[in-house]
UniProtKB/Swiss-Prot annotation:
Coiled coil stretches, renumbered: none
Protein name: Probable weak neurotoxin 3FTx-Lio1
MF terms in GO: toxin activity
Source species: Erythrolamprus poecilogyrus (Water snake)
Region forming the signal peptide: 1-18
Tissue: Expressed by the venom gland.
This protein's GO CC annotations: extracellular region
Cysteines engaged in disulfide bonds, as pairs: C21-C42, C24-C29, C35-C60, C64-C75, C76-C81
Cellular location(s): Secreted
Family, similarity comment: Belongs to the three-finger toxin family. Ancestral subfamily.
Matches recorded under Pfam families: Toxin_cobra-type
């Protein structure tokens, strides 16, 4: 009985969880962004030549973005894991 109750509590707590990521495009950055329930990944996409990460794009995604040949991408599944790499 105790296991059933713990399972129900865990399912209830997890059901409303949404991931939090850093969100940034070329001009505007928001350090704290709540993703939709469908967006289960954080990502950071940057040019390989941009060593400082000044033009990095960060955000939430349902699937990991496919980088262009001159880009790098990092996808992760924990809150605010999409820092500069």
């Amino acid at each position: 009985m105790k296991a059933v109750i713990l399972s129900l509590v865990a399912a209830f707590l997890y059901s409303g969880y949404t991931l939090n990521c850093r969100k940034c495009d070329e001009t505007v950055c928001q350090l704290y962004w709540t993703c939709t329930e469908a967006e289960t990944l954080c990502y950071i996409l940057k040019n390989k030549t941009d060593t400082m990460g000044l033009q990095a794009i960060q955000g939430c995604a349902e699937t990991c973005p496919v980088p262009e040949p001159d880009q790098e991408v990092k996808c992760c599944k924990t809150d605010y894991c999409n820092s500069y790499f």
